[in-house]
């Protein structure tokens, strides 16, 4: 008996088809409804007491089973509080604290419950007990001092802070204590606390904040003493000074604010002399800024800037003399130099006259630069020129804040561009965004509308839509999308974004209608212009229906797309969507379970495990969808085979194999692997070759292609055998005729032949017999 799988002669579909929908419907019908708890209605006091007793028994049973679960204690106590039984509530909390006194949420819920019931003294006592047991938990201390301050007990608040400070807490705790004293104008107390704080946390940031505190309260000598204490603590160790560079910088800046420039210079030099240049970048940069403002560094900086100005002027003069087109890179560098000089002067606190002169120089450079209008009408020559206008407008808006001048710059740039030949969307968009920043929304809309009417571009539509969506003007955004589609209905991105807008607005009908219009545009072909990238619209449409869990529509879309293109990637995506459908359904079920099981105590509530029935249902669903995916893979394979697309068949088999490795069995995987082709080397004639040259090439031979070709191969083999037999028969007849002629000639030679002649005749006869035997053997063959 043959062990091979039986050959299927009838490949027609079965008369009764079982679909995945029927399987799911039958499983749903057989599923039993979950049992629901009956609704209780309390009619009188006795029923209420019975209900309370039953609930208490339930809680006590839970605690007996697991008394270490603090969430059960908290729920029990909260329930007693909701019943108005505060004594029982306190008793439960105290029992819980006996079990686990170091559980922070227990203390917090206990104190919150007391404060909710306006039992302030109880809350105080609880906080006192809590900070005694958990002194390292800052949250308890913060709540304790906040309660005391709310009650107006400032001395009590100080006592709590003093108890807290004995534990040397973090810096924020010390700052909270200091802020308390500052709020009640106890600055001397705050200064004393600062001294204790830097003793506990002697880091540079604390020294600086203490000195700033003393400076703000007007005690400048105390501020200097603080910095001197900090420098004494730091010492002259190189590593310590490197970490404390901010202390030296803050000390010098304070002296600068007090106009003690020599003191500040001495501090900078003291630090720079003791630190190498590689480790003193921060101090050196501060010292450079200081000298620029108050020392001789200003003249040095002015000299450097002056030399660079002369260099740029010489380059520009050489370009004008040579008649070469304008080099906008030089103008960019020149304008950047003047802008940096203005910003440096502004940062160092230059006088008003100096700032005005710097602004005047920047404007002069920009005006000279934008006067170099390109002579050609090619967009590539205008691109960098337009960026000069944009930088000029940004300088006026951000640095000088001359908004009227900024608006005039944008208008002049737009008037200069030949919009009939080309336009710059960035220029229009930046102008509109400027008006938005000035809260001139109407002007921004007019600008973008004029841009679209004068020279429509996709970026202009996108920016206009982005503006309206950010302003929540969705109706306006819809109108702009409609205008964009009227202008260019072949743009796939516009269709997709329009539909995504409707989807985000939860208008699925409009989104689906837009996708249908986009697909219809793609299916229209040359008559309607088609789409530049129709696959984007199809993919977005399918993903949309998949997210909406419209499985029938997903299948219908795939079938439509396959009827149109039949690409192997579409087949693969169609097949994999079946198994992805099972994952999506399971995720939806898990989300529904999470919504039902949601509770305030997220950490204490374990995730729900699936029952055996639910697990079996999911497994059954996955198996059904996996079978559907296999059917699609088989359809795809047959389709590609009929179209003789070998490379696409290999790609399909690779995806099919990966699918079976994840979701199939060893049997299904072996079936797919058996379909893989083998590579063979063949020869063929070179195209357009006059001498009939041959070339070798590699071809893919599929097993099922070989099986179908076996019948034709046998017929051809029989034809070759018949032809060979006919040729052998003709050759035998010719040999027989020649041998009979030779025999007659030897007989007429005479009877008086000698014995030698007889021997020769016998040898001839033997040779003839050998020839006859050879012919017979050839005929049989």
Curated annotation (Swiss-Prot):
Organism: Mycosarcoma maydis (Corn smut fungus)
Family matches, as Gene3D superfamilies: Tetratricopeptide repeat domain (1.25.40.10)
Example GO BP: spliceosomal complex assembly
UniProt similarity note: Belongs to the crooked-neck family.
Segments of skewed composition (Low complexity): 724-755
Keyword terms of this UniProt record: mRNA processing, mRNA splicing, Nucleus, Repeat, Spliceosome
Subunit and partners: Associated with the spliceosome.
Protein name: Pre-mRNA-splicing factor CLF1
Superkingdom to which the source organism belongs: Eukaryota
InterPro entries, A to Z: HAT (IPR003107), HAT_Syf1-like_N (IPR055433), HAT_Syf1_CNRKL1_C (IPR055430), Syf1-like (IPR045075), TPR-like_helical_dom_sf (IPR011990), TPR_rpt (IPR019734)
One family name in Pfam for this protein: HAT_Syf1_CNRKL1_N
Primary role: Involved in pre-mRNA splicing and cell cycle progression. Required for the spliceosome assembly and initiation of the DNA replication.
HAT repeats: 50-82, 84-116, 118-150, 152-183, 185-216, 218-257, 259-293, 308-340, 357-391, 401-437, 439-470, 472-504, 506-547, 549-580, 628-665
Subcellular location: Nucleus
């Amino acid at each position: 008996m043959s062990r091979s799988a039986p050959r299927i002669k009838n490949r027609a579909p079965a008369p009764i088809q079982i679909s995945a929908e029927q399987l799911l419907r039958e499983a749903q019908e057989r599923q039993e409804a979950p049992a629901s708890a009956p609704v209780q209605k309390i009619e009188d006091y006795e029923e209420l007491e019975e209900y309370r007793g039953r609930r208490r028994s339930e809680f006590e049973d839970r605690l007996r089973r697991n008394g270490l679960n603090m969430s059960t204690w908290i729920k029990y106590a909260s329930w007693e509080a909701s019943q108005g039984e505060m004594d029982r509530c306190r008793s439960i909390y105290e029992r819980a604290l006996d079990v686990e006194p170091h559980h922070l949420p227990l203390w917090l819920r206990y104190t919150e419950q007391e404060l909710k019931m306006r039992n302030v003294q109880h809350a105080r006592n609880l906080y006192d007990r809590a900070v005694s047991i958990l002194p390292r938990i800052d949250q308890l201390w913060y709540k304790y001092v906040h309660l005391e301050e709310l009650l107006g007990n400032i001395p009590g608040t100080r006592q709590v802070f003093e108890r807290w400070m004995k534990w040397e807490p973090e810096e924020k705790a010390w700052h909270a204590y200091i802020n308390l004293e500052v709020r009640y104008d106890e600055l001397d107390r705050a200064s004393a606390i600062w001294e204790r704080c830097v003793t506990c946390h002697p880091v540079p940031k604390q020294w600086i904040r203490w000195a700033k505190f003393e400076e703000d309260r007007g005690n400048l000598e105390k501020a200097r003493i603080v910095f001197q204490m900090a420098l004494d603590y730091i010492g002259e160790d190189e590593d310590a000074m490197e970490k404390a560079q901010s202390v030296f910088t803050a000390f010098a800046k304070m002296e600068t604010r007090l106009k003690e420039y020599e003191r500040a210079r001495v501090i900078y030099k003291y630090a720079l002399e003791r630190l190498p240049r590689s480790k003193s970048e921060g101090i050196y940069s501060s010292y450079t800024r200081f000298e620029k403002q108050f020392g001789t560094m200003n003249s040095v900086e002015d000299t450097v800037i002056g030399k660079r100005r002369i260099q740029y002027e010489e380059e520009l003069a050489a370009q004008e003399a040579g008649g070469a087109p304008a080099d906008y890179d030089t103008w960019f560098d020149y304008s950047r130099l003047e802008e940096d000089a203005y910003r440096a002067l502004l940062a160092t606190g230059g006088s008003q006259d100096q700032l005005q002169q710097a602004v005047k120089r920047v404007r002069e450079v920009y005006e000279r630069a934008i006067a170099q209008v390109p002579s050609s009408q090619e967009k590539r020559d205008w691109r960098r020129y337009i960026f000069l206008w944009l930088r000029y407008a940004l300088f006026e808006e951000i640095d000088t804040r001359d908004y009227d001048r900024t608006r005039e710059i944008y208008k002049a740039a737009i008037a200069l561009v030949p919009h009939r030949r080309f336009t710059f969307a960035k220029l229009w968009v930046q102008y509109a965004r400027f008006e938005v920043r000035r809260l001139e929304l109407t002007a921004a809309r007019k600008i973008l509308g004029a841009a679209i009417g004068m020279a429509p571009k996709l970026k202009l539509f996108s920016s206009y839509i982005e503006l309206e969506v950010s302003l929540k003007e969705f109706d306006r955004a819809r109108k702009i999308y409609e205008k964009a589609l009227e202008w260019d209905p072949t743009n796939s991105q516009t269709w997709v974004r329009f539909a995504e807008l409707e989807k985000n607005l939860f208008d699925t009908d409009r989104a689906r209608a837009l996708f249908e219009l986009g697909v219809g545009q793609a299916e229209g072909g040359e008559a309607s212009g088609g789409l530049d990238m129709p696959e984007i619209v199809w993919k977005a449409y399918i993903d949309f229906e998949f997210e909406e869990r419209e499985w029938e529509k997903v299948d219908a879309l795939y079938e439509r797309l396959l009827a149109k293109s039949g690409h192997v990637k579409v087949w693969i995506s169609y097949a994999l969507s079946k198994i992805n459908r099972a994952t999506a359904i399971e995720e939806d079920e898990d989300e529904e379970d999470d919504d039902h099981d949601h509770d305030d105590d997220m950490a204490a509530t374990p995730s729900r495990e699936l029952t055996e029935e639910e697990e079996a249902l999911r497994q059954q669903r996955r198996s059904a969808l996996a079978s559907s995916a296999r059917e699609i893979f088989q359809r795809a394979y047959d389709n590609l085979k009929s179209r003789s697309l070998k490379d696409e068949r290999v790609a399909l088999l690779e995806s099919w194999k990966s699918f079976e490795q994840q979701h199939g069995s060893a049997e299904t995987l072996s079936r797919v692997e058996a379909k893989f082709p083998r590579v063979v080397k063949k020869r063929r004639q070179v195209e357009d070759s006059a001498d009939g040259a041959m070339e070798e090439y590699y071809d893919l031979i599929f097993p099922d292609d070989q099986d179908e070709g076996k019948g034709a191969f046998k017929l051809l083999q029989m034809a070759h055998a018949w032809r060979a037999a006919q040729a052998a028969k003709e050759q035998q007849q010719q040999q027989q005729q020649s041998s009979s002629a030779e025999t007659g000639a030897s007989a007429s030679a005479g009877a008086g032949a000698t014995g030698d002649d007889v021997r020769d005749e016998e040898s001839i006869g033997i040779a003839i017999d050998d020839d006859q035997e050879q012919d017979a053997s050839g005929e049989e063959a």
